[in-house]
Regions:
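Tandem repeat scaffolds
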Residues: 3-9, 15-167
Length: 167
């Protein structure tokens, strides 16, 4: 079954229209999606190239060892998502909600973050390299081994954040 079909089936399942919970493993995708409910969807060792997601819910989802290149996420809700060992390259995040998320071993390279929120999130070994953006907010963000090398953000507001054992 294609990655697209698995994703669309999960949306149907969440909306009570049949389908089945998504367990995407070792798949690849390059499609555009809008208005999907992918809450609790599990993605593992999958690659996305040029995929776009608009007004999509990823709450309580789990992503492990995924590769995303040139993808866009507009007005997506990633609250309580758990991501581990994922790499985002040249991806754009606009008005994305990542509150209460957990990022482990993730890397963002040459990505754009606009209107992002990371309230109450927990990061471990997260690299944000050569990224840019504006209006990135986080209250009570916690993180160790966080690296923002060569990244530039306007209106970056971290309140009560504790990164790399600093106040």
């Amino acid at each position: 079954m294609s990655a697209q079909q698995i994703i669309l089936d999960h949306d149907k399942w969440r909306k009570g229209l049949g389908g089945a919970p998504a367990g995407l493993a070792g798949q690849s995708d390059a499609n555009a999606y809008a208005g999907l409910d992918l809450e609790t969807a599990q993605f593992a060792a999958s690659s996305f190239s040029g995929s776009s997601f608009t007004d999509t819910v990823f709450r309580h989802a789990g992503w492990t060892a995924c590769q995303l290149d040139g993808c866009s996420f507009t007005r997506c809700n990633f609250e309580h998502i758990a991501m581990a060992d994922c790499v985002f390259t040249r991806c754009a995040f606009d008005q994305a909600q990542f509150s209460q998320s957990s990022l482990r071993g993730c890397r963002f390279v040459q990505c754009t973050w606009n209107g992002m929120n990371f309230d109450g999130s927990d990061w471990r070994n997260v690299q944000v390299l050569e990224c840019k953006g504006t209006n990135v907010n986080a209250r009570n963000l916690r993180g160790e081994q966080v690296d923002f090398t060569n990244s530039y953000f306007e209106q970056l507001e971290f309140e009560g954040a504790l990164l790399n054992n600093t106040l």
